[in-house]
């Protein structure tokens, strides 16, 4: 550590007895090694101002900044942990300070649920451009609920990965329902999913799952060289979110579907679709 530097400063050649040439050579060598170690130990460990090498970073960048639900960040992290997938979290100020190339050093950006207006407003217009360009040039993207709204042509610094399409809320919102267990059909099976003020995604990408009214609940597509998956429901939702609701699908099955979406986004896999 840095204390070793103070020790090396006492290793001056003039402090050695005259005629101790051999000892002088040995101690001088030790001093050089200790000084080198000291400066290495004192070097800042952060990645500010540089793009980390691929071996230094996790493959997944998880946004946990303003507007996203801390509970949903925790839910996503639990799925990632169960799948043995490493991630790094990034808040709004840090993401605002990242260049396109820095963002693109990751393989997948996940933006969880929350308030898409606050989320977008916490980021600068140039940051939205950097994210958009990173996706165009190969970064993959998974948007969950608010993250899906943010991917569209949102007036709140939206990424507009959708050629101008702005997503609307799923029809339950117009009936005054704010959260519910909603049955989606995906891959030939019916899954009861936790829904809370999420979008319907009709009009963009390939439809992988549908709401009961036939509108798109989960879609998949590309933007430039980037692979994009958007979901209006929360398959990652923990059991605690289900209180007071009736689900016919177990939380383990729903969470397994969340893991499927994450891996598909990470590995650029086309899932069963309509």
PLM feature segments, named:
Residues 38-41:
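C-terminal motif of bacterial Sec signal peptides marking the signal peptidase cleavage site
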Residues 1-23:
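N-terminal secretory signal peptides that target proteins for export/translocation
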Residues 43-45:
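Bacterial signal peptide processing site
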């Amino acid at each position: 550590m840095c204390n070793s530097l103070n020790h090396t400063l006492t290793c001056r050649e003039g402090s050695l007895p005259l005629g101790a040439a051999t000892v002088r050579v040995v101690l001088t060598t030790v001093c050089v090694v200790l000084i080198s170690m000291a400066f290495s130990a004192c070097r800042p460990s952060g990645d500010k101002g540089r793009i980390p090498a691929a071996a230094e970073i996790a493959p997944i960048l998880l946004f946990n900044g303003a507007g996203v639900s801390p509970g949903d960040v925790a839910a996503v992290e639990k799925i990632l942990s169960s799948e043995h997938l490493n991630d790094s979290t990034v808040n709004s100020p840090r993401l605002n300070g990242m260049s396109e190339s820095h963002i693109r050093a990751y393989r997948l950006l996940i933006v969880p649920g929350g308030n898409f207006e606050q989320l977008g407003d916490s980021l600068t217009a140039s940051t939205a451009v950097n994210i958009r360009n990173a996706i165009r040039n190969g970064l993959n993207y998974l948007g969950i609920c608010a993250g899906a709204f943010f991917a569209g042509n949102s007036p709140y610094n939206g990424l507009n990965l959708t050629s101008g399409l702005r997503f609307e809320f799923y029809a339950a919102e117009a009936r005054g329902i704010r959260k519910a267990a909603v049955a989606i059909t995906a891959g030939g099976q019916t899954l009861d999913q936790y829904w809370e003020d999420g979008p319907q995604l009709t009009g963009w990408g390939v439809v992988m799952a549908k709401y009961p009214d036939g509108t798109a609940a989960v879609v998949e597509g590309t933007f430039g060289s980037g692979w994009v998956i958007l979901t209006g429901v929360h398959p990652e939702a923990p059991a605690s979110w289900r209180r007071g609701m009736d689900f016919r699908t177990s939380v383990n099955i729903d969470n397994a579907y969340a893991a499927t979406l994450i891996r598909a986004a990470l590995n650029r896999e086309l899932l069963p679709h309509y």
